[in-house]
């Protein structure tokens, strides 16, 4: 059953990377003018800026800072490099707290020079090392399972079932899951695993875009909602059946859309959100 229609923008969040050509100040101004209520901030947009002041600026534009992207990339054969990743994730947690958001999304990483099982253990150990720091900072860690095509270098966590297993292993309110339709729409167990995620209180974030047919780039050819084959309304229905009523985050990496006029693209995002999500 499809959920109720989205008639306003009260739950619409857009990731800064979706409109990558804009700096964060321009994004804040344009999002606010369009009636968008939430923003997820990618860490690269904060470089060279006072993070606390940037958070204040975003809130002054009426934007809720939904989450920060991204932490993770824990696995490496080299123990020294694994420690560098932990250190960077600690900084990411501190940045999220300073910015004024309570969620840090984790793209967990993988090392193709070692077995996936080793990468998965290193992800578990990395999150375990960070969880006390996250709790002290008031920042929840959202494990984002990625499509299996990214199991080589981007993430060894590739199904929602696996992300649920890992989150539940910590028994912590500070470790949960981010559900991104681009990575999970194909999974025959998706409805069941979304329900499970909600039952354990672990559903921290919901990301939308579309899967284009054909897809011409495995990373940078995501579609605007309605351009592809993902059953967005159905999946949103499953998410909302868990009791989730948070922001719906538009996350689109697209060389095609980044070449377009970004103000026009923003208008299309708003229309597609109402029509197809």
Label each region the model flagged.
Residues 18-20, 43-45, 71-74, 108-112, ...:
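Active-site-proximal loop/turn and secondary-structure-junction residues that shape catalytic pockets
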Residues 37-38, 64, 102, 140, ...:
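Residue-level detector of anion-binding/catalytic polar loops
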Residues 2-5, 25, 60, 75, ...:
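Active-site acidic/histidine proton-transfer and metal-coordination neighborhood
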Residues 40, 67-69, 105, 142, ...:
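Conserved beta-strand positions in the central sheet of alpha/beta enzyme cores
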Residues 74-76, 224-225:
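Short clusters of hydrophobic/aromatic residues that line enzyme substrate/ligand-binding pockets
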Residues 1-35, 100-101, 157-179, 183-277:
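Histidine-acidic metal/acid-base catalytic patches
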Residues 30-48, 69-72:
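N-terminal substrate-binding region of glycoside hydrolase catalytic domains
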Residues 47-57, 114:
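Active-site-adjacent beta->alpha loops and helix N-cap segments on the catalytic face
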């Amino acid at each position: 059953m499809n959920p109720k229609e989205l008639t306003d923008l009260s739950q619409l969040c857009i990731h800064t990377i979706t409109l990558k050509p804009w700096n964060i100040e321009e994004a804040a101004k344009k999002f606010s003018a369009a009636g968008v209520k939430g923003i997820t901030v990618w860490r690269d947009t904060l470089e060279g800026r006072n993070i606390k002041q940037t958070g204040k600026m975003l809130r002054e534009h009426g934007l809720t800072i939904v989450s920060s992207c991204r932490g993770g990339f824990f696995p490496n054969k080299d123990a020294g490099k694994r420690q560098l990743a932990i250190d960077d994730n600690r900084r990411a947690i501190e940045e999220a707290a300073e910015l004024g958001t309570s969620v840090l999304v984790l793209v967990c990483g993988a090392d193709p020079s070692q077995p996936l099982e080793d990468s998965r253990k290193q992800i578990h150990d990395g999150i375990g090392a960070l969880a006390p720091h996250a709790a002290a900072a008031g920042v929840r860690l959202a494990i984002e399972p990625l499509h299996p095509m990214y199991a080589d270098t981007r993430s060894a966590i590739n199904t929602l079932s696996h992300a649920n297993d890992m989150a539940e292993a910590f028994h912590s309110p500070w470790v949960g899951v981010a559900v991104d339709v681009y990575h999970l729409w194909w999974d025959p167990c998706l409805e069941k695993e979304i329900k499970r995620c909600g039952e354990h209180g672990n559903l921290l974030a919901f990301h939308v875009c579309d899967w284009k047919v054909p897809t011409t780039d495995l990373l940078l050819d995501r579609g605007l909602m309605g351009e592809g084959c993902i059953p967005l309304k159905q999946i949103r229905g499953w998410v909302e059946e868990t009791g989730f009523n948070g922001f719906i985050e538009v996350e689109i990496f697209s060389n095609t859309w980044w070449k377009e006029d970004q103000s026009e693209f923003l208008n299309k995002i708003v229309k597609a959100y109402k029509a197809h999500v």
